[in-house]
C-alpha cells in the first residue's frame, strides 16, 4: 500500500488549498500593487480551498493536513536560525506538519459534504497549542465575497452543488448561491482621512544584529532620523515596529530624548519593559501630554510562552530561553491609547492576528507593530496581511501596520482602499 504521506493527489489538493496565499505572496514579492489583480486571482483561487477540503478522500486527509501545515507554517521554524538549535529546523517543520495532519484527519473524517461544510467553517475555532493562524476564512480577504460565516457557507454550498450535482438546476442554484455571497459594498472605499497624517515606519534591522549591543547606537540614530523626517512632513504621529528599541526603554537615557521630541510629534514605539523579574513586550506612546504604555496580551506560542503542561514547560523554557531570570509575561487585558481626540488600540505582532483583540473592542482604529525579521524571507508577511485584512473587513476596523523587514501599510475595512508603504532602500 502506498504511504499516505507521499500521496501525490493529497499534495496537489494541498496546493489548491493554499493557492490564494501563495499567489498573493508572489504579487507581494514583485511589488505588484494593482488591487484588481489580487482581487481577481483571490476570488478565483480562494474557493479552491473549499473544493480541496470537500474532495479529499478520508484516506488522504492526514496527508492533506500534513502538506497544508508544511506549506502554510514552515516559516515558524525559521526563527531557529537565530538560536543554538539551527539543526532542529527540519524537525520543527515536520512536527508542525504532523499536528495539522492529525487535525485535518479529524476534520475530514466523514466524507459527507455537509459535514465537510461544518468542519470547514469550524476549523478557524481550533487552535493547536494556542496558534490561531489557520483561518481558511481569511483566504477570502481579498475576494469579492463577504467574509462572514454565513456568506462563506453559501460559497461552500455552491462548491457542493457545482461539483457534485450533475443536473442543470443544481448548477443554477450554485451560481445563485455565489451571487448571494458577493460583497456589493466591497468596492466602496472607506474614509481614511483620520489616519492620513500618521507616518508608518518600515525598518530593515537584521535579526542577528537587532539585539547586538554594539548596534544599539545605529538603531537609536535611525529612530531619531525617522522622527525628524516625519516632523518635516508635518506628521502628527510616527509609528515604529515591534521592539524597534530592543532593550528596556524605561531604563535607558534614550527615553528622555523621545520625551523631548514628543513635544512636536507623538511617537509610538515597540520596546521591552521590565517589572521585577517579569519581561513585557510593550508599546510606548510619547506625546506632549504624557507617556502611555500597553503590554502585549496574547503571547506567541513557543516564541514567548510555552503552551504546555508545567512539567514540560519549565525544562523547555530553560532549554530554549536560557538561564535568564526574566521570562515573558502578558498583560491581563487590552489597552486603548488616546491622543487628542484620536483613540486607537495598539497591538504587537502575533496578537494583531487574534480574534479577541477585535471582537469586543470599541476602537475603530488599530495599530499593529511587528518584527518580521525572524521569518524573512518567507510567506509569513503575506499570510499576516491576509489575516489582518480579514479582521479589518470582518469587524469593520481600520488597521495600520508598522513592520521590520516587511511592508508597512494601512488596511481599509472595505475591499479597496489599502495603502502600502514599501521598505526603504
From Swiss-Prot:
Q: Where are the transmembrane segments?
A: 12-32, 34-54, 60-80, 88-108, 120-140, 142-162
UniProt keyword list: Acyltransferase, Cell inner membrane, Cell membrane, Membrane, Transferase, Transmembrane, Transmembrane helix
Q: Where in the cell is it found?
A: Cell inner membrane
- One annotated GO biological process: lipoprotein biosynthetic process
For this protein, the Enzyme Commission number is: 2.3.1.269
Topology term for the membrane: Multi-pass membrane protein
Its Gene Ontology molecular function terms? Answer: N-acyltransferase activity
Q: By its UniProt entry, which Pfam families does this protein fall under? A: CN_hydrolase
Q: In which pathway does it act?
A: Protein modification; lipoprotein biosynthesis (N-acyl transfer)
Catalytic positions? 242 (proton acceptor), 296, 349 (nucleophile)
- Signal peptide: which range, if any? none
Instruction: Indicate the principal place this protein occupies in or around the cell.
Output: membrane
Q: What Gene Ontology terms describe where this protein resides (cellular component)?
A: plasma membrane
Domain CN hydrolase positions: 201-425
Matches recorded under Gene3D superfamilies: Carbon-nitrogen hydrolase (3.60.110.10)
Q: Entry's InterPro entries?
A: Apolipo_AcylTrfase, C-N_Hydrolase, C-N_Hydrolase_sf
Q: What class of enzyme is it?
A: transferase
Against NCBIfam families, the record matches this protein to: lnt, PRK12291.1
Q: What does this protein do?
A: Catalyzes the phospholipid dependent N-acylation of the N-terminal cysteine of apolipoprotein, the last step in lipoprotein maturation.
Family classification: Belongs to the CN hydrolase family. Apolipoprotein N-acyltransferase subfamily.
Protein name listed in UniProt: Apolipoprotein N-acyltransferase
Q: Which organism is it from?
A: Helicobacter pylori (strain ATCC 700392 / 26695) (Campylobacter pylori)
Amino acid at each position: 500500500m502506498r504511504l499516505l504521506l507521499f500521496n501525490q493527489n493529497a499534495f496537489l489538493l494541498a496546493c489548491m488549498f493554499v493557492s490564494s496565499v501563495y499567489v498573493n505572496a508572489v504579487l507581494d514579492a514583485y511589488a505588484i500593487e494593482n488591487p484588481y489583480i489580487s482581487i481577481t486571482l483571490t476570488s478565483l483561487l480562494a474557493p479552491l480551498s473549499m473544493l480541496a477540503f470537500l474532495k479529499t478522500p478520508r484516506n488522504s486527509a492526514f496527508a492533506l493536513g500534513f502538506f497544508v501545515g508544511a506549506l502554510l507554517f514552515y516559516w515558524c521554524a525559521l526563527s531557529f536560525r537565530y538560536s543554538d538549535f539551527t539543526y532542529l529546523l527540519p524537525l520543527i517543520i515536520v512536527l508542525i506538519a504532523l499536528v495539522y495532519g492529525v487535525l485535518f484527519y479529524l476534520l475530514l473524517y466523514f466524507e459527507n459534504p455537509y459535514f465537510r461544510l461544518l468542519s470547514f467553517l469550524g476549523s478557524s475555532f481550533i487552535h493547536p497549542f494556542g496558534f490561531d493562524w489557520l483561518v481558511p476564512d481569511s483566504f477570502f480577504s481579498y475576494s469579492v465575497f463577504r467574509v462572514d460565516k454565513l456568506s462563506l457557507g453559501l460559497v461552500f454550498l455552491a462548491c457542493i452543488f457545482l461539483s457534485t450535482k450533475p443536473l442543470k438546476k443544481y448548477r443554477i442554484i450554485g451560481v445563485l448561491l455565489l451571487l448571494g455571497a458577493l460583497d456589493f459594498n466591497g468596492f466602496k472605499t472607506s474614509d481614511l482621512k483620520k489616519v492620513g497624517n500618521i507616518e508608518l515606519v518600515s525598518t530593515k534591522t537584521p535579526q542577528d544584529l537587532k539585539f547586538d549591543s554594539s548596534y544599539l547606537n545605529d538603531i537609536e540614530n535611525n529612530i531619531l532620523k525617522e522622527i525628524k523626517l516625519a516632523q518635516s512632513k508635518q506628521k502628527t504621529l510616527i509609528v515604529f515596529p515591534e521592539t524597534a528599541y530592543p532593550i528596556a526603554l524605561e531604563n535607558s537615557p534614550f527615553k528622555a530624548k523621545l520625551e523631548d521630541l514628543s513635544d512636536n510629534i507623538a511617537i509610538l514605539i515597540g520596546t521591552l519593559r521590565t517589572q521585577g523579574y517579569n519581561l513585557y513586550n510593550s508599546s510606548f506612546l510619547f506625546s506632549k501630554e504624557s507617556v502611555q504604555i500597553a503590554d502585549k496580551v496574547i503571547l506567541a506560542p513557543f516564541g514567548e510562552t510555552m503552551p504546555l503542561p508545567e512539567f514540560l514547560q519549565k525544562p523547555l523554557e530553560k532549554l530554549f530561553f536560557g538561564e535568564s531570570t526574566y521570562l515573558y509575561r502578558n498583560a491581563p487585558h487590552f489597552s486603548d491609547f488616546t491622543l487628542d481626540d484620536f483613540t486607537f488600540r495598539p497591538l504587537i505582532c502575533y496578537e494583531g492576528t487574534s480574534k479577541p483583540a477585535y471582537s469586543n473592542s470599541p476602537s475603530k482604529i488599530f495599530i499593529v507593530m511587528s518584527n518580521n525579521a525572524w521569518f524573512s524571507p518567507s510567506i509569513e508577511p503575506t499570510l499576516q496581511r491576509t489575516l489582518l485584512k480579514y479582521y479589518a473587513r470582518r469587524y469593520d476596523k481600520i488597521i495600520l501596520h508598522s513592520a521590520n523587514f516587511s511592508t508597512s501599510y494601512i488596511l481599509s475595512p472595505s475591499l479597496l482602499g489599502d495603502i502600502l508603504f514599501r521598505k526603504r532602500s
